[in-house]
A protein has these predicted regions:
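N-terminal secretory signal peptides that target proteins for export/translocation
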Residues: 1-14
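Acidic Asp/Glu-based divalent-cation binding sites
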Residues: 78-81, 88, 188, 219, ...
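Right-handed parallel beta-helix
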Residues: 139-240
Length: 435
């Protein structure tokens, strides 16, 4: 092991610490309520506003997820809802309202829904009735569980198969979530209209964008607000008519131009585009890997868009790595690599146009989500910006391992291009397959 390479135990501790820092390792206000969900039933609260989570089951001490959400909405200030290991919360109450009585779980006040314990991860199954969560107002933090079975294709309700973040929402943090098997016209898993939404260490896979509208899209994510996606993977989602996994749509209601910042993240093997940014939207990509998508890796469409990228790989996508509007504003001269010379990277010492990065398929290598890492002979190794932080490399990679690592042992440690920094903490560096 080279001196700069972390031990397996140290890496695991760093990941736990990073997750804690990303989430909520701070004391709650004294007035906060804490509810522990102990029932898988989908039953509302019997006396909303009394400060007690007590479902309408006639049994003392029964707290359902729906009842806990209703009590948290009625309780002033920030409240916590703790989920129980191994429980599956299947939503069964059909109907649409904003009170969390039926359909999705509506968040109207500051609330955290959490699972940070050991054991089998809880699952919130929307059961095809509607999405799982809708954040109307207040701040919301969702941590540590799976979101499945969401459907947003009802009349007047087409956005966010698993989660919808509305324009009036406050700070929204989504961390350590797995969102899979959800469907919507706009944002198969996540739809964001919010101005302060962050996705950290999440995995989106097998979500679908339906085709009921001509501008449907975003099989995993549709953004019309301000969204940061970091240390996350977006894999194997299916967009209709090639509209792809992540869509950034301009002209959000009552706000400025939408922005998506993609950092230390992997977007791979999606049906359609990896990322589609339309009109006056801004896409910022840092230390990311966008590869193996069925049509185009990144498309900047329409007029007035902005595309900024550094230390990132766009490669081996089905049709082209990039399709970029002639009117787009570009800032791409920052140690980037594409495999087919379509991303308008200036040829020179700080970019690598037309170079195959030689990556693995998305697999788990010890982090939360599947990632595509460099093969041992990959040209991305030690080729990113020589500076750490500021205008240079991110200080950690997608799996929260430190950068840089002197993988080749030549005494000169420098960051790798893309989401993953190759180190010796991998049993098999070069699997039989490649991306």
């Amino acid at each position: 092991m080279h001196p700069a390479t972390p031990s397996h135990a140290a890496t695991a501790n760093r990941r736990r610490g990073a997750a804690c820092a990303l989430l909520l390792c701070a004391a709650l206000p004294a007035q906060a309520a804490i509810f522990t969900v102990n029932s898988e039933a989908d039953v509302p609260d019997d006396a909303i506003g009394d400060g007690e989570c007590h479902a309408e089951l006639g049994l003392p001490g029964v707290c359902t997820l729906r009842a806990a959400i209703q009590e948290a909405n009625a309780s002033p200030g920030l409240d916590q809802i703790w989920l129980t290991a191994g429980q599956v919360y299947v939503l069964t109450r059909a109907g649409q309202d904003a009170s969390a009585a039926n359909g999705d779980l509506d968040i109207q006040d500051d609330v955290q829904v959490l699972f940070l314990a050991s054991g089998v991860r809880p699952v919130v199954d929307a059961n095809g009735l509607e999405r799982a969560f809708e954040v109307h107002e207040g701040s919301a933090t969702l941590v540590g569980f799976d979101l499945v079975g969401g459907e947003a294709s009802l009349p007047g309700d087409h956005s966010g198969g698993a989660i919808a973040v509305n324009f009036d929402a406050g700070i929204v943090q989504l961390s350590l979530l797995r969102l899979h098997g959800n469907r919507a016209n706009f944002g198969g898993a996540l739809y964001n209209d919010g101005a302060q939404t962050t996705v950290s260490a999440c995995e989106f896979f097998a979500n679908t964008a339906l085709d009921d509208f001509t501008d449907s899209g975003g099989a995993a994510i549709r953004n019309r607000g301000t969204l940061l996606v970091e240390n996350s993977s977006v894999l194997e989602n299916s967009g209709v008519d090639g509209l792809g996994a992540i869509a950034i749509e301009s002209t959000p209601p009552f706000s400025g131009e939408p922005t998506l910042t993609l950092v230390n993240s992997t977007v791979a093997r999606n049906v359609g585009f990896g990322v589609l940014s339309r009109d006056a939207a801004t896409l910022v990509v840092r230390n990311a890997t966008i590869a193996g998508n069925s049509t185009v890796g990144v498309r900047i469409a329409g007029a007035g868009g902005t595309f900024q990228m550094r230390n990132s790989v766009i490669a081996r996508n089905g049709d082209e790595d990039c399709v970029i509007s002639a009117t787009a504003t570009l800032n791409l001269d920052r140690y980037n690599m594409d495999s087919d010379d379509t991303c308008e990277l200036s040829d020179g010492s700080s970019n690598y146009p037309g170079v195959d990065p030689w990556l693995t398929p998305p697999m788990r290598r010890g982090g939360f989500a599947r990632v595509a890492w460099p093969l041992t002979h990959s040209p991305v190794i030690d080729q990113a910006h020589p500076v750490i932080g500021a205008i240079g490399c991110e200080e950690q990679d997608q799996d929260f391992n430190p950068r840089p690592v002197d993988f080749d042992g030549d005494g000169s440690a420098r960051c790798d291009v893309g989401a993953i920094e190759l180190d010796d903490d991998v049993v098999f560096h070069d699997p039989w397959e490649r991306l």
